[in-house]
Amino acid sequence: MAEFEERPRLSIGEEEAPPYPLEKLTGGRRTRAQIHALHQQAGRVPPQAVELEQAVLGAMLIEPEAIPRALEILTPEAFYDGRHQRIFRAIVRLFEQNRGVDLLTVTEELRRTGELEQAGDTIYLSELTTRVASAANVEYHARIIAEKLLRRMIEVMTLLVGRAYDPAADAFELLDEVEAEIFRLSDVHLRKAARSMNEVVKETLERLEAIHGRPGGITGVPSGFHQLDALTGGWQRGDLIIIAARPSMGKTAFALSCRNAALHPHYGTGVAIFSLEMGAEQLAQRLLTAEAASMPRRPAPDGCATRTGVSWPARRPLSDAPIFIDDTPSLGVLELRAKCRRLKAEHDIGLVIVDYLQLMQASHMPRNANREQEIAQISRSLKALAKELNVPVVALSQLSRAVETRGGDKRPQLSDLRESGCLAGDTLITLADGRRVPIRELVSQQNFSVWALNPQTYRLERARVSRAFCTGIKPVYRLTTRLGRSIRATANHRFLTPQGWKRVDELQPGDYLALPRRIPTASTPTLTEAELALLGHLIGDGCTLPHHVIQYTSRDADLATLVAHLATKVFGSKVTPQIRKELRWYQVYLRAARPLAPGKRNPISDWLRDLGIFGLRSYEKKVPALLFCQTSEAIATFLRHLWATDGCIQMRRGKKPYPAVYYATSSYQLARDVQSLLLRLGINARLKTVAQGEKGRVQYHVKVSGREDLLRFVEKIGAVGARQRAALASVYDYLSVRTGNPNRDIIPVALWYELVREAMYQRGISHRQLHANLGMAYGGMTLFRQNLSRARALRLAEAAACPELRQLAQSDVYWDPIVSIEPDGVEEVFDLTVPGPHNFVANDIIAHNSIEQDADVVLFIYRPERYGITVDENGNPTEGIAEIIIGKQRNGPTGTVRLAFINQYARFENLTMYQPEPGTPLPETPDETILPSGPPDEAPF
């Protein structure tokens, strides 16, 4: 890593060149200091209305009804004052979560995100509420602020134009920046307000009158395939149509059949084709070949054929057709949008075709975004383009390899289009109410909430799940971290790393994964303290098998007495506890008070059966699902009594004494449950496998280590029983006189280095100044090669004035290295769609979701013969047959349309239309024969 250059701090009054070069003035990275310095140089003050900003925020704080009115007009960027941007974002977050918005809640939200001081502190927030008496004029004030934003953006454009005179500036990079700014400006300008029903109905009736009388019930742009048009009504205006298939299935050939839209005598319209894969000449050759093949097969007059076998009359319809081909490689969304706008204005195009989606480039993606999110942004941009131009946009898309690995007939499905991975069916999804549910049991459920990581704040938040679904049978891999957290996923499923989201097949041992540092808990308990305590003892040292008396065993007399007391407190006179002292143990028998008739059971047995934990042997034990829906205090009570059974709390003596705090069990499920319950108390325990050799079953230890986690255990959980309380006191005495060595809960250098480097660059802080701010001797680059503890990261964030690092230091993320990635069989897999954050907590690991398709229509091309399938389910031959599967249609039915695929011409035809003349053999290749053609003025329909 190169060392930073020493740069002087910004001095507003200096005449010399500012320390921020204009090259840094890009749409997503410019700072308020940069803009202000540039304006000072130009001698102008940026357009602003700070007093009105204060009035709008004050109105939003005192009157909740002002919030939606302001949100329709303003974005955070509309506010000139950085304090106001932070306050506005806090209000928006509270509003989106349906939480109350007032001075107190906004203050607390800013304090939670560490932005309270940057937002002006509590005094400034209080002053905002006095700036306005009511919210009556909030909409008028908001429009003035929005107008100032437009003027400010126009002025930024003027500054960018000034860069054209800089000989060191890259012209193409400058062009991209200017184009991005123009579209940011137009995006603000084109935001629409709600329209009245009267206006909408009038436009709808005019549209219906215009299409009245069209043959075939086609209301949009025809595809040229009768059965397909019967299901879709043609490609509708404002729709995004995705045509997806594996390579060599005929995606481009199918899309080029849409040339019929340009050549149709009744529905003719301009077509724009953006080919990122093939050149314009290649497309023209395919169009000519397909067009010639569609003409009547007649003897060709002399001189009417070319050497390639394509008849000259085929040129006439295509040459005159309003088809526009652009073969720019790696086309960006902004550039595509600009070209489509121009073609719409100059030629009134009615259809846009993009070939293909995965070759496009998104603009201004977040630093930790992955390819799936980039494709999703491109898809959303294409949908926005379709609505803006009011034309259908047809985008081709490559399906994932999951189609090839799936068994059966390999028909494509929607999950193949999402470019996302999947999780094994037993993966436990943490719902927002605390429950952990296997993902397979969530299939077909909708609109439930999970915990997800906000990618901007790195905090866990509630997020709604729009869909849970099965994606087929696929190979899975078991991924295990150093803490022992484990998850089984397909090779293409993504997990969060310091470098962004990565697929399983891109990960390797040693890479850091994002895990939640804590899981929020419920606010109201549903179990009493006595029930929680009794459960802890019975799960740990209880015998609850059928046809056996409920029995508890302990070596401590005080614990035996406690369990007998708890049973009486919970079940009253229904049970009669009996304590029997044996040689080394105390047995507590929890018998029913009355003799049990046939069909009657001990009330404790019924209780445990209702909780789902009756009849389990030691290696099968688990924590009831209801425990995960309790408050943190209730969970602590349960763990305190569970630890009194098979838990260890003691000081290990020797040359280097250390505290040993762990829970031991032969049940892997119980160990995972205990680890997850500790996480709800903010304790990141390690699950360790301990082999027993010939002594017995493998044991699993849930180990609490590290000063911070041990102190949380002492303070939140504690101990029960004289023996463990004394041991816990010794542990606390040891911790109270020692400092911690936080080498586990760290911020990886790969995550924080670039953030601090950018902050230093923008604020003109040199290496020496940074070390001085930290109170350290200058050490060169040594600091920048280390992982940081959270405390040290906070100090560095203050020294470098880096709010992003402060967020990471106060985040809900624990970065844990991977220890193994192993194949783990082939089975049915599943996934979720979580709009917004696009992730969720699964097996106490943060996993990416499957992004919902923005398309209005999704078509799949399926040719069975490509997979060696020679006959269909009815015994009919599949040679030359293609299925067009409508996997999704927002405003119409789904279904399958069968078409003919003429391989020689790479052309699709209506299955009933294509009838070769008897005795006319099809050529093996187009180059081996001269194609006959009809009269030059004959239409192709």
From Swiss-Prot:
Catalyzed chemical reaction(s): Couples ATP hydrolysis with the unwinding of duplex DNA at the replication fork by translocating in the 5'-3' direction. This creates two antiparallel DNA single strands (ssDNA). The leading ssDNA polymer is the template for DNA polymerase III holoenzyme which synthesizes a continuous strand; ATP + H2O = ADP + phosphate + H(+)
Chain positions recorded as ATP binding sites: A245, R246, P247, S248, M249, G250, K251, T252
Molecular function as annotated in GO: ATP binding; ATP hydrolysis activity; DNA binding; DNA helicase activity; endonuclease activity
Post-translational modification: Upon expression in E.coli this protein undergoes self splicing that involves a post-translational excision of the intervening region (intein) followed by peptide ligation.
Domain of life per record: Bacteria
BP terms from Gene Ontology: DNA replication, synthesis of primer; intein-mediated protein splicing; intron homing
Domain DOD-type homing endonuclease residues, every copy: 534-683
Keyword Hydrolase tagged: yes
PROSITE patterns assigned: INTEIN_C_TER, INTEIN_ENDONUCLEASE, INTEIN_N_TER, SF4_HELICASE
Ranges where the record places region Disordered: 1-25, 914-941
Cellular component GO terms held in the UniProt record: cytosol; primosome complex
Pfam name, any one: Intein_splicing
Similarity remark: Belongs to the helicase family. DnaB subfamily.
Subunit (UniProt): Homohexamer.
Protein name per the record: Replicative DNA helicase DnaB
Organism field: Rhodothermus marinus (Rhodothermus obamensis)
Organism lineage string: Bacteria, Pseudomonadati, Rhodothermota, Rhodothermia, Rhodothermales
Gene for this chain: dnaB
